[in-house]
């Protein structure tokens, strides 16, 4: 006999699972309401911001630079990086860092969102990171305004909100970033990307040029990695 095998869930686990259900219900409501797409638009923009930060932070981790970040209201974004001296592998990893960025961020948010203290630390860390980005790398008006608003919301919720509010915010954002992995998956299988500055080879197309195999192969690799990371994050969140 193993007494703990069928024991009730701990209070933190019950709370976390309830928050996940609530976040899912809110998300469903956003998609069902006539104006839900408008209300959900900020989360599309958030996935863009996380994508571009994924490129920039990966470049920094691999010894490169992060010069500038721009994003626009249509959901497009670009990160200007210094990859001088990067070989093919480091260049490809920097590109992949943006493609898997939303999934990695979602998994991290799920992990920290299991507890109220973890959620508060997550919001504080994200708020400070975004403020640093605001000063150091964001270089267009829309990007500056959006990044500043997200940073302010994170810090305000962490410092003034209740523990439950912080936890709900982190879990809700994790759900939105997780959904963006699937709702924006078409970008993993396109050769051309566009923004107000023009049309350019997509991330997977440049990866193909660096590593020879076709762009769709690298789209599959990044997609599979994203799903695996998400699964890991949800499993930890669910208490397994």
Report residues per predicted region.
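Metalloprotease/metallohydrolase-associated module, dominated by Zn2+-dependent proteases
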Residues: 2-29, 74-238
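N-terminal signal-anchor transmembrane alpha helix
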Residues: 10-56
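Small-residue-rich helix-interface/hinge motifs
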Residues: 36-91
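Residues in and immediately flanking transmembrane alpha helices
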Residues: 64-68, 111, 239
